Amino acid sequence: EFRRVLFRSAGIVEVDGKPVMMDNGQQLEYFPLELKLNLTGSSYVKTAGARMAKYEVDRTSHSDGRQPDNDIVLFRYADALLMKSEAKVRNGEDGSLELNEVRGRVGMPYREATLENILKERLLELVWEGWRRQDMVRFGVYHKSYDQRVQLADEKNGYTTVFPIPQKSIDLNPKLKQNVGYK
């Protein structure tokens, strides 16, 4: 279940007005200007920075709510539909049916299935699920610079988008060559 939480600098509340409580029983307060790289020992260790609560935690399974019985989401049907839409588009087919099934679930209007539209939809639908970097690499936009960001020299040869091939694999198959940037 998607849960929206209102962020402001006073006490944090859920959409229904219920206060969000910290583990010490106090209402959570958001201190956006107190964000630091090292919060160790700071009173803001638990209150700095924004939070995302995408899935409801089963707080009734244990008295402290720390060991919920509900399962974590690993793969979602919407992700499978977006993958199918992408595969169709990459094969020269129309992937609009799958893309718009995802969009229709939340009342969004029809959109043509293009790689650009699919990437945008993956950003919106799969936010905070850990797929964005790999999506950007796969769609070839990971290296595109954005405002205020300097492009690193190593990015031009792909060093920052691929992982090293394990040495054991190279030893087993002499035809494998290590990816550029790794020794």
Region spans (language model):
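A generic secondary-structure boundary signal that marks alpha-helix termini
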Residues: 86-87, 127
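Structural motif corresponding to the intra-repeat A-B loop/turn of tetratricopeptide repeats
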Residues: 89-91
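Structural register within alpha-helical repeat arrays
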Residues: 77, 84-86
